From Swiss-Prot:
Entry keywords, A to Z: Coiled coil
Name of the protein described by the UniProt record: MATH domain and coiled-coil domain-containing protein At2g05410
Domain of life: Eukaryota
Stretches assigned to coiled coil: 227-291
PROSITE patterns noted in UniProt: MATH
Disulfide bonds: none
Family annotation (SMART domains): MATH (SM00061)
Any matching Pfam family: MATH_2
MATH domain ranges (all copies): 6-132
Organism: Arabidopsis thaliana (Mouse-ear cress)
């Protein structure tokens, strides 16, 4: 387990307007001894949103040691090359694990905003700046190990998922039989993206309130709302999120009360320390008072 520093990555997406719905990826880079890449959906993972989706992704996650985890904070900025003040910035943080290795923003910016605000697209290029801060790493990747060019996927109820995700996806369908009864997306890339986001969301909501920040819960709410709009039936997950928000409120309330009680207790603690000090002094005086007198001390001194 280790704490690492942050790194800033700039990714220039060329010929943006000609890109289709398939996901695109930045070059792989290393932060904190871990491989990362930025993943984007030029048309969004839900066409109804008409948006640009942006995520941080762990590549070659199948090659990572069992039990690996990494906690990262990412800040994505879409650079407005005409005016820096108009640049769009969003921040999130997430525990990346074997079954939830992608996290970010289904709606980083809408196409309407991209086209309306002059300066984002210059000569057909969109500039993305990502600041990645790896907060904690459990189980390091050997970055010298070559990545496998082919990643095997398995079909589970019409979704192409990685072997490490199969059990989690099967459990989702077993416990929620109608989860995709009204799911609208047909594009296989977009379906995979939605499933990855859903798995990341379920992993997030399984964390303790202590591990989750209010910003993290807010991000989870945005991701959940987005997934619901694709037609996924996630009533049970909404309930889970509400319960987690309530537990977070209780946790914060308890912390406030504990701090208040501790502040109230401080004067008494100081008083107790003062009394203990007085008791020690009194005991010393008591021992001195109980010392027997020697009748010969004065005689010896006079001789």
């Amino acid at each position: 387990m280790e704490t690492t520093v942050d790194t800033t990555i700039t990714w220039v997406i060329k010929n943006f307007s000609s890109l289709q719905s398939a996901p695109i990826y930045s070059d792989i880079f290393v932060v904190g001894g871990c491989k990362w890449r930025i993943m984007a959906y030029p048309k969004g993972i839900n066409k109804a949103h008409d948006s640009f989706s942006l995520f941080l992704n762990v590549p070659d996650n199948e090659s990572l040691p069992t039990g690996w985890r990494r906690h990262a904070k990412v800040s994505f900025s879409l650079v407005n090359q005409g005016s820096e003040k108009l640049s769009q910035r969003k921040v999130t943080q997430h525990w990346f694990v074997q079954k939830a290795f992608t996290w970010g923003f289904p709606v980083m910016i809408t196409h309407t905003e991209l086209n309306a605000k002059m300066g984002f697209l210059v000569n057909g290029e969109l500039k993305v700046v990502a600041k990645i801060e790896v907060l904690e790493v459990v189980g390091k990747l050997d970055v010298s190990k070559e990545s496998s060019p082919i990643m095997k996927t398995i079909d589970v109820n019409g979704f192409q998922v990685l072997p490490s995700q199969v059990d989690s996806v099967k459990r989702l369908f077993e416990k929620n039989l109608d989860i995709v009864s009204k799911f609208r997306l047909k594009n296989p890339y977009l379906k995979t993206a939605c499933m990855n986001l859903l798995l990341s969301l379920t992993e997030t909501l399984c964390q303790s309130p202590q591990e989750l920040s209010n910003d993290g819960l807010s991000d989870a709410g945005v991701a959940l709302a987005y997934l619901i709009e694709t037609g996924l039936k996630l009533d049970w997950l909404e309930k889970k999120l509400d319960e987690l928000k309530e537990k977070k409120k209780k946790e914060e309330s308890c912390l406030v009360r504990l701090r208040e009680m501790d502040e109230q207790l401080q004067p008494f603690k100081k008083r107790c320390l003062d009394i203990e000090d007085q008791i020690s002094k009194e005991k010393e005086e008591l021992l001195a008072a109980r010392e027997p007198l020697s009748l010969y001390d004065d005689i010896d001194n006079n001789v």
